[in-house]
Structure formats: structure tokens, C-alpha cells
């Protein structure tokens, strides 16, 4: 995903999640395990959100880019950012299908 398109997709994902009552804690935070796109909180649960965007299915669906290894690294990043591993953490994805002129969002909870 290009930098401008990636930024746009993250903006749309964040707007969507804030509208659902999430509270933003960090954005684009780097850890030794990788970067966290969005780190939020909702109802006492910390939520790591991976944002994936595809303009078309030519290079695969956005979900295909979220591998088991990526899920593991996201969880490690969450624990690193929190500084402990006994707090409730949920991993989610916002998949952005399309372009700024014509898109739809898909919001998923990722299995650990």
C-alpha cells in the first residue's frame, strides 16, 4: 500500500472506530516486533488494529495479508506497549476495499 493511500485507509478506519466508541491511545507506534497501525481502548479492553487496504483483488484480498505470524507479532507488540501481559487485549482488523472515491470497510476480530 502506498504511503498516501495507507494514510487515507488508516484515517477512514480510525473515523469508523471512533464512531463506535473506541478511544485512540497510539497511532503508528513502532515496537521491536513491528509497527502497530492503531492502538485503542474500548470498554476496558486494549485493542490493536491492523489496517489493510486493497484497491482491487488483483493482488489478493486485504485479509490475505494478515498471516498467523503477523497476528503473533501484533500481540507481542501490544504486550510490549502495555509493559505487561496480564491486561485484556483484543486484535482486530479493518479491511478497506476500494479507493477514496469508492470504498467499503470490513471490521473483524482476529483469532488468537
UniProtKB/Swiss-Prot annotation:
InterPro entries reported for this sequence: Restrct_endonuc-II-like (IPR011335), tRNA_endonuc-like_dom_sf (IPR011856), UPF0102_YraN-like (IPR003509)
Pfam families membership: UPF0102 (PF02021)
UniProt-recorded Gene Ontology molecular function terms: nucleic acid binding
Residues annotated as signal peptide: none
Source organism, top-level taxon: Bacteria
Family as reported in the entry's similarity comment: Belongs to the UPF0102 family.
Alphabetical list of PANTHER family matching this protein: UPF0102 PROTEIN YRAN
HAMAP family found in the cross-reference section: UPF0102
Protein name: UPF0102 protein TT_C0005
Organism whose genome encodes this protein: Thermus thermophilus (strain ATCC BAA-163 / DSM 7039 / HB27)
Source organism phylogeny: Bacteria, Thermotogati, Deinococcota, Deinococci, Thermales
Amino acid at each position: 500500500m502506498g504511503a498516501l493511500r495507507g494514510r487515507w485507509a488508516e484515517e477512514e478506519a480510525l473515523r469508523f472506530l471512533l464512531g463506535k466508541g473506541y478511544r485512540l491511545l497510539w497511532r503508528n507506534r513502532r515496537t521491536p516486533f513491528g509497527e502497530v497501525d492503531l492502538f485503542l481502548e474500548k470498554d476496558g479492553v486494549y485493542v490493536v488494529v491492523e489496517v489493510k487496504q486493497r484497491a482491487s483483488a488483483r493482488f489478493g484480498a486485504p485479509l490475505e495479508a494478515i498471516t498467523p505470524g503477523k497476528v503473533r507479532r501484533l500481540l507481542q507488540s501490544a504486550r510490549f506497549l502495555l509493559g505487561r501481559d496480564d491486561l485484556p487485549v483484543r486484535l482486530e482488523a479493518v479491511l478497506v476495499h476500494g479507493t477514496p472515491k469508492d470504498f467499503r470497510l470490513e471490521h473483524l476480530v482476529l483469532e488468537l
